Amino acid sequence: MKIKTGARILALSALTTMMFSASALAKIEEGKLVIWINGDKGYNGLAEVGKKFEKDTGIKVSVEHPDKLEEKFPQVAATGDGPDIIFWAHDRFGAYAQSGLLAEITPDKAFQDKLYPFTWDAVRYNGKLIAYPVAVEALSLIYNKDLVPNPPKTWEEIPALDKALKAKGKSALMFNLQEPYFTWPLIAADGGYAFKFENGKYDVKNVGVDSAGAKAGLTFLVDLIKNKHMNADTDYSIAEAAFNKGETAMTINGPWAWSNIDKSKVNYGVTLLPTFKGKPSKPFVGVLSAGINAASPNKELAKEFLENYLMTDPGLEAVNNDKPLGAVAVKSFQEKLEKDPRIAATMANAQKGEIMPNIPQMSAFWYAVRTAVINAASARQTVDAALKDAQGRITK
């Protein structure tokens, strides 16, 4: 193994020398890796992985976390500039790939097998792999162990639980009803879907927003509101405050919410989202991914860094120790992280969920479904009319 690594590093050094002499005009510096990652992620940990890479190869790695990098990247990459590697949630990468800004990646089968298969689906665009999946985010049911030691397994149990808790001055469940990202798991459980995914691509005309299953899910949500088990005006901050003050027994949120709950000292657990009609809730799954700039002259170096330095147990551990990654795509490191039941639950919900489509048409989906849920929840429209309108807006 050591000989192989040594040979690989020699080959990379030779490649770098060749690249230096090849083109002095490229905007992206050759023989150096520049990485962009968001400021809320473990960029110091990533820089440590970069130091190890530099020590082994002599190639300097610079980790930057510019503001609004997801908007800056397409602007600079279109002119042949920007970072060699960009980290962001996978759903932005479809538009980048459509504009020709990301290099196709070609990991071998042995490397692909190290990751959970569903994570590769997140970084496929028109049948090609356009990034490496790194970490996995999905909503889970978060519950107050002192109020509900055994959280409900089904949505159908929630009205009776709420009745019992109301008698004690509490409520069963509060979560953000203003954003479809949070309401979608229930709407999708019985067969709703955003865009049909077939043969490695999305069919933008095959939308499941006004399917029978979506109507059943939204009708159940509207009934919870009509029967005063939930309030149509609940948004993210209202739900978070109610849970963290111990006023409501459960909420639906992701790993980013855990640190505030930790500070609130609520005795909480994270578990599977409830089933609806016997079927699992289907949260949208976001995958933090690493793409390689199509304009980079350092594509082989970027591949070496990502596959053999970052996407290893020690590499991911360095980033995770800086800022928790949540669940991860690499099986061996996920198995270590799953000792934390919160992370095991995140991955279990993700595996039952729906990969967030990485296509530009998602902006129309978010807008239309948001309006539909708000209108149905506030009784401005019937469920059928609201979802029919949404379907029309998305497919027009």
From Swiss-Prot:
Keyword flag Transport: yes
Cellular component terms per the entry's GO annotation: ATP-binding cassette (ABC) transporter complex, substrate-binding subunit-containing; outer membrane-bounded periplasmic space
Cellular compartments annotated: Periplasm
Superkingdom of origin organism: Bacteria
Disulfide bond positions: none
GO molecular function, one term: carbohydrate transmembrane transporter activity
UniProt record, GO biological process: maltodextrin transmembrane transport; maltose transport
One Pfam short name: SBP_bac_1
Signal peptide: 1-26
Keywords from the named record: Periplasm, Signal, Sugar transport, Transport
Gene3D superfamilies the record matches: Periplasmic binding protein-like II (3.40.190.10)
Subunit structure comment from the entry: The complex is composed of two ATP-binding proteins (MalK), two transmembrane proteins (MalG and MalF) and a solute-binding protein (MalE).
Known role: Part of the ABC transporter complex MalEFGK involved in maltose/maltodextrin import. Binds maltose and higher maltodextrins.
Family per record: Belongs to the bacterial solute-binding protein 1 family.
Name of the molecule in the record: Maltose/maltodextrin-binding periplasmic protein
Organism: Klebsiella aerogenes (Enterobacter aerogenes)
